[in-house]
Amino acid sequence: MATTSDLRTNMIIRYNGQLHRVVEFYHHAPGNWRAMVIMKLKNLETGKTIEERVRAGSEIEIVRVEKRPMQFLYRDGDVYHFMDTETFEQIEVPEEMIGEPAKFLKENEMADILFYDDNKILGVEPPLFVTLQVTEASVAVRGDTATNVNKQVTLETGAVISVPAFVNQGDYVRVDTRTGEYIERIK
């Protein structure tokens, strides 16, 4: 058994008999009390996020998860279709299982699918950064450059993000899929 000192963000653990993803955690030692670890956990079955306090050094059960790289094929409503490039096996993943990064998935891009017990899908980990084309962008008004001016643009996947005023329609931008933030313009 592992202890709370082995915790890492995005780790899958079994807590109270159910599978949870560690969203965040931190060690807290209040004055003359015993140290504790405060964990924010996302239940993989219900999707609910809870905050739990456990004594530092408590035993936790880390679940072994298999990551398989798969190619994103297409989206059909709220269902995303992925294919294993070695076996050509196709799977369907509901949008709520992917979460916020779903809006940055581009067709034919690779993503890691997390499996438990060989066939149960736990989630999808898209690449940390993706390069997408800007399909719609408002024109920056001359004279609005006294401060850092951001504008909203629509990307080829339909996602809307905030970018600096110099980004125009047709430009390629790099986006962080974890936060949805603009990183840089690609030339």
Curated annotation (Swiss-Prot):
Gene that this sequence comes from: efp
Organism field: Roseiflexus sp. (strain RS-1)
Family as reported in the entry's similarity comment: Belongs to the elongation factor P family.
Keywords: Cytoplasm, Elongation factor, Protein biosynthesis
Region forming the signal peptide: none
Pfam family, one: EFP
Protein name: Elongation factor P
Localization per record: Cytoplasm
Tree of life domain: Bacteria
Record's function text: Involved in peptide bond synthesis. Stimulates efficient translation and peptide-bond synthesis on native or reconstituted 70S ribosomes in vitro. Probably functions indirectly by altering the affinity of the ribosome for aminoacyl-tRNA, thus increasing their reactivity as acceptors for peptidyl transferase.
GO terms for cellular component: cytoplasm
NCBIfam families according to UniProt: efp, PRK00529.1
GO annotation, biological process: peptide biosynthetic process
Biochemical pathway: Protein biosynthesis; polypeptide chain elongation
